[in-house]
């Protein structure tokens, strides 16, 4: 629910009538002013942290205050908002994603862009709509739950590639991505009026 989402920028919580660094594009995300001004103020009990900012924004103390089994998407590159080992040291139940390939759950646009475009090209689509994006998301989710092929398993050595906290998203070089995502988009495009 939108009222459960709090957006922060380099100046803190984006709240209504905030003056410093309040661009018009941020105003749509402004929450009522309840006196909470920092990420540390609003992270208490949070289920999800989605960071696309810079290194060391999320501290271990903040992670401790999050809800049970929090999802932490620390996506800044090359150094995320918090490194997975630091988060796991204080919250073993955390599900952590980064943009880095040297940690589990790498979130990278390489998982979808090539295959979304392939699907669009296959049907002559001139635009990528929300339904096509959702079809890609559902195809990726299906793959994350599917049993791994020998090709994928051999490419990633002894890593456990069964769905769980350290594997919620397919690996970028999973050859099944193209055969799942592109056709899923094609079906959506064809079924639309």
Can you describe what each PLM-predicted range is?
Residues 4-6, 47-50, 70-73, 93-96, ...:
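Structural motif
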Residues 76-182:
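Adenosine-phosphate binding glycine-rich loop
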Residues 35-36, 40-92, 124:
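Long hydrophobic segments that form regular secondary structure
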Residues 1, 63-64, 163, 175:
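Short glycine/threonine-rich loop-to-helix capping motif typified by GTGT followed
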Residues 30-34, 53-54, 100-104:
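A general structural motif
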Residues 1, 16-21, 61-63, 83-88, ...:
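Short acidic, glycine/serine/threonine-rich loops at helix termini
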Residues 186-193:
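Residue-level detector of conserved catalytic or cofactor/ligand-binding positions
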